[in-house]
């Protein structure tokens, strides 16, 4: 891993709900963004759609493994049901790099907190010590990311990692995308963020919203 400024971000499984919005914000902020998908063609199609929104040609679609190999840092945004299989297939390409895992193992139809360990702890154990895993972005509604791309978002990102550099880079990514971010401890703590997703889904359903999220009070950055 490197201390240099990270310039290339791979959004792995980036054709779903969360990935495209993150890709738009990071591309707008000046990062080179790679959209990864199980099939390169799908990644290329979504990348073309995002480039059209931004009126640029800065986002590239690739197969997940190729995107992970080319990137300085990768962000995993696959559906939680594909979490383990995606990690196993990506392990060789992620060696020596940082992976930010956005996974929250929540059934949207019946949201309940998952059992520990956290998804990010599972990822770290599967990938081994040669990959530095951080967890972030679990509590961010996908729908808010595409709005007002040049404006900061009124929400906070909670970042978890056992590796200081991985946490720092995840925070930098969040801030690059217009989000305030906090180091919230190690990977074991990430189970709390997954549980908060269940809470937010329940609240959004009750109050007929799609954009409910979290903001920290009483801590100044």
Question: Could you describe each region identified by the protein language model?
Answer:
Residues 61, 132-136, 182-184:
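General beta-strand structural signal in soluble alpha/beta enzymes
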Residues 155-221:
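Active-site-lining helix/loop region of Rossmann-like oxidoreductase modules
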């Amino acid at each position: 891993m490197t201390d240099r400024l990270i310039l290339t971000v791979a959004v792995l499984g980036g054709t779903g709900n969360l990935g495209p919005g993150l890709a738009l914000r990071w591309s707008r902020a000046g990062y080179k963004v790679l959209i990864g998908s199980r099939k390169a063609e799908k990644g290329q199609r979504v990348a073309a759609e995002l480039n059209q929104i931004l009126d640029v040609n800065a986002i590239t679609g690739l197969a997940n493994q190729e995107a992970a190999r080319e990137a300085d840092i990768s962000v995993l945004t696959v559906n939680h049901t594909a979490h383990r299989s995606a990690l196993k297939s990506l392990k060789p390409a992620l060696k020596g790099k940082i992976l930010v895992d956005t996974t929250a193992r929540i059934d949207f139809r019946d949201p309940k907190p998952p059992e520990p360990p956290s998804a990010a702890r599972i990822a770290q154990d599967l990938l081994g010590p040669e990959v530095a895993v951080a967890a972030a972005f679990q509590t961010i509604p996908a729908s808010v990311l595409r709005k007002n791309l040049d404006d900061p978002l009124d929400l906070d990102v909670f970042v978890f990692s056992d590796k200081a550099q991985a946490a720092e880079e995840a925070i930098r990514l969040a801030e690059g995308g217009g989000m305030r971010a906090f180091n919230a401890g190690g990977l074991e703590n990430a189970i709390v963020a997954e549980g908060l997703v269940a809470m937010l889904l329940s609240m959004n359903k009750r109050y007929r919203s799609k954009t409910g999220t979290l903001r920290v009070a009483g801590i100044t950055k």
